[in-house]
Amino acid sequence: VWLLPEMADSLGGRMEVLELWPLAQCEIAARPRSIVDELFAGDFADRYPFDRDDFIERLTAGGYPEALERRSGRRRQAWFDSYLATILQRDVRDLAQIEGLTELPRLLQLLAARSGGLLNMAELSRSTGLAQTTLRRYMGLLEVLFLIRQVPAWSSNLGKRLQKSPKLFLSDYGLMAH
């Protein structure tokens, strides 16, 4: 529907847009509460008997159902390779007139390394060699493709909140580890 804007326009009031995020660990494990909820409830240790290797495996597997279906790390890597190639080549070409298709994979790698940190456009511009206006356009496109998310700064003071830098996250921890 999004690729045919005239169709989306004609469905006004008859469609709903849902953002589907990768699965959370509680969804993957079919648990009613999240790990954070159980940690605060004080019953974390008894319910999650996994060790460091299990934890790393869970993180690198991510939350995309298709990636989770692949049991071996090699097959998951192949899925992530294919997923990123499809999005960064075909979908980008369909959505925008971008001349720097070759720059997007490297930009995504740099953003993955900075995931969870404050977004510093000047430093990112120096690291990539891209102008800040180009970076903003590319990052907007990566957000539309649900690969990254910018989380606004938080402060109880509205003025400070508007001045602070947002944090940047990749949409999936398996994608970030890839």
Regions found by a protein language model. Name each.
Residues V1-L3, P22-E27, S155, L175:
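Conserved nucleotide-binding/hydrolysis micro-motifs of P-loop NTPases
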Residues V1-M7, L142:
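Sensor-1/coupling segment of RecA-like P-loop NTPase cores
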Residues W2, V17-L23, K164-S171:
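Short, exposed beta-strand "edge-strand" segments with a Pro/Gly-rich flavor and a Y/T-containing core
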Residues P5-A113, G117:
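Interdomain motor-coupling "hinge/lid" segment immediately C-terminal to the ATP-binding subdomain
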Residues L68-H178:
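Accessory nucleic acid-recognition modules appended to NTPase machines
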